[in-house]
Design a protein with these regions (language model features):
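N-terminal active-site segment of His-dependent metallophosphoesterases
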Residues: 1-63
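Residue-level marker for buried hydrophobic side chains located in beta-strands
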Residues: 10-12, 50, 78-79, 159, ...
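Active-site glycine-centered loops adjacent to acidic/histidine catalytic or metal-binding residues
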Residues: 15, 52-53, 81-82, 162, ...
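A short, flexible beta-alpha/helix-coil linker loop
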Residues: 16-19, 123-127, 165-167
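Short active-site segment of divalent metal-dependent hydrolases/proteases
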Residues: 18, 55-56, 84, 165, ...
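Short acidic, glycine-rich surface-loop motifs adjacent to enzyme active sites
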Residues: 51, 151-170
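Extended active-site neighborhood of metal-dependent phosphoesterases/phosphodiesterases
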Residues: 59-156, 176-200, 208-216
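Core regions of peptidyl-prolyl cis-trans isomerase
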Residues: 172-174
Length: 216
């Protein structure tokens, strides 16, 4: 119905990880596929998000990525991935400067229809070149508590971030999960904040697809 934002489609992608200009042909094909999917719904509004690793450390490719994603015909928001960090600075606080220059804050929220969306940054650069852990800083935890204070308990909340908060055991075996950079080390704090809501967490990082129930 015209003006009705309670019915819409949502598309999540992750880890396009563009490392060279020649990779954009593959991204264009994926963008065209998204556009075809959107058209197949006969005018239903859509929005999307990329859950990080937009590029593979060459942040000069952000502009071209944005141009190619316009082919989808829908608004795409972005979460930051570990490859989107500047992982050669002196501190965590300097690691997200390139991302913020292009896309704005690394954590934010928005509403579409009756759904509240939250985007977080759980890539924590530890000050040694290319080393990071999955960790949600206290500043974001406190911000999230304030943000959700205006959301009715029992409402649906969708959290988008890059490094998964948890994984199934069978999926752990495919990756280096002995490394603290593979999952969010302090995920219990996030789960506690989300407990009053019908929460769904969407992430990337592992280059595979799985669904992991968290709450009983």
């Amino acid at each position: 119905r015209a003006g009705d934002d309670s019915r819409y489609g949502f598309i999540a992608i992750a880890d396009p990880q563009i490392w060279a200009p020649k990779e954009f042909a593959k991204l264009a094909a994926a963008a065209d596929d998204i556009a075809a999917t959107v058209r197949s719904y006969g005018g239903m509004p859509f929005h999307g998000i990329c859950c990080g690793d937009i590029v593979s450390h060459d942040h000069s490719l952000y502009g071209r990525y944005n141009e190619v994603m316009e082919r989808t015909g829908i608004t795409f928001r972005n979460a930051m991935g570990n490859h989107d960090m500047k992982v050669y600075g002196r501190s965590y606080e300097t690691s997200f400067s390139k991302f913020e220059q292009m896309y704005g804050p690394v954590y934010y929220s928005f509403d579409v229809g009756r759904i509240h969306y939250v985007v977080l940054d759980d890539n924590f650069f530890i000050g040694r070149d290319y080393f990071y852990i999955g960790y949600l800083e206290e500043r974001q935890m406190r911000w999230l508590e304030k943000d959700l204070a205006r959301v009715q308990p029992g409402s649906t909340v969708v959290v988008c971030l890059h490094i998964p908060s948890t994984c199934e055991e069978q999926d752990r075996k495919q990756f280096r999960y002995d490394r603290a950079g593979s999952t969010m080390t302090n995920h219990r704090g996030l789960y506690e904040i989300l407990k009053p809501y019908r929460a769904h967490i969407i992430s990337g990082h592992t280059h595979t697809t799985f669904n992991q129930p968290i709450a009983p």
